């Protein structure tokens, strides 16, 4: 008797980018820290009835092949290959979230300095005691207000707020990592990949390959006290030889 246990391994090999260009040297991708994976086959069933309660015949109609996976590893590079198929760039966006307050000085202005190698790209707000937000204005801030100069990364405050403790959050970029600007492409433009699911338990193996998958969902949900597990969904279709899926097992 053959059974399976565990989440298995899922390999995705990009075949085509969103512009329809074949990948010259496809690089297989192993979805990391797999939580669960599935391949589903469903069919429409048409029933023929006469005057009695039960069908006199039934026939299979259209079929549908779908897949889904939940994997904890976060990779913009992988997401681009499997979901977007667009142009990946170097660099990433980071956020400085203040957990220690600083007093508004006598000069009424604070210049923020990002970590070494970082470039400030935007204001993410100022908070006072109890998390009460200050209101950003264009000029002449009053009590509880501030201005932000994007050119000099300077926050300015009202004279009445001198000495008040504030938390300042901002956004900055660094040269490391990856980034992706997702464009609004015409309908029908999407990457294609081959999917392979492999399960091994007690010396016996189960293998499923789908030659063509297109993604139809990427979900990222956070939890207060748990890991973020991105989930994917995809739809399969036949290759040029009419093969929809390939299965193998010990039994």
Give, region by region, the residue ranges found by the protein language model:
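Short, hydrophobic/aromatic-enriched beta-strand segments in well-ordered soluble domains
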Residues: 70-72, 164-173
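Mixed-charge, glycine-accented linear interaction segment located at domain edges/termini
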Residues: 129, 156-160, 205-251
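Strand-loop-strand motifs at the edges of beta-sheets in extracellular beta-sandwich domains
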Residues: 145-160
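Residue-level recognition of well-ordered beta-strand positions that form the cores
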Residues: 68-70, 169, 198, 233-235
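Extracellular interaction modules
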Residues: 62-66, 157-167
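Short, surface-exposed beta-strand/loop "edge" segments at domain boundaries and coil↔beta transitions
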Residues: 19-22, 77, 162-165, 176, ...
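Solvent-exposed edge beta-strands and adjacent loop segments
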Residues: 1-82, 205-231
């Amino acid at each position: 008797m053959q059974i399976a246990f565990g989440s298995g391994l899922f390999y995705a090999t990009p075949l085509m980018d969103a512009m329809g260009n074949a990948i010259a040297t496809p690089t297989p991708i192993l979805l990391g820290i797999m939580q669960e994976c599935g391949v589903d086959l469903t069919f429409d069933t048409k029933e023929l009835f006469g005057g009695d309660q039960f069908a006199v015949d039934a026939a299979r109609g259209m079929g549908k092949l779908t897949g889904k996976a939940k994997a904890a590893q976060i990779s913009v590079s992988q997401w681009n290959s499997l979901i977007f198929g667009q142009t990946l760039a170097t660099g990433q966006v980071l956020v400085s979230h203040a957990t220690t307050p600083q007093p508004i000085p006598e000069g009424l202005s604070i210049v923020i300095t990002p970590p070494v190698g970082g470039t400030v790209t935007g204001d993410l707000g100022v908070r006072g005691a109890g998390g009460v937000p200050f209101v950003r204005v264009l000029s002449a801030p009053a009590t509880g207000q501030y201005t932000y100069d994007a050119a000099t990364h300077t926050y300015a405050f009202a004279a009445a707020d001198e000495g008040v403790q504030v938390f300042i959050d901002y956004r900055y970029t660094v040269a490391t990592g990856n980034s992706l600007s997702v464009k609004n492409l015409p309908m029908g433009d999407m990457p294609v990949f081959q999917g392979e699911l492999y399960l091994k338990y007690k010396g016996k193996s189960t293998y499923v390959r789908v030659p063509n998958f297109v993604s139809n969902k990427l979900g990222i949900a956070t939890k207060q006290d748990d890991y973020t597990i991105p989930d994917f969904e995809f739809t399969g279709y036949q290759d040029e030889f009419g093969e929809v899926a390939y299965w193998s097992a010990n039994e």
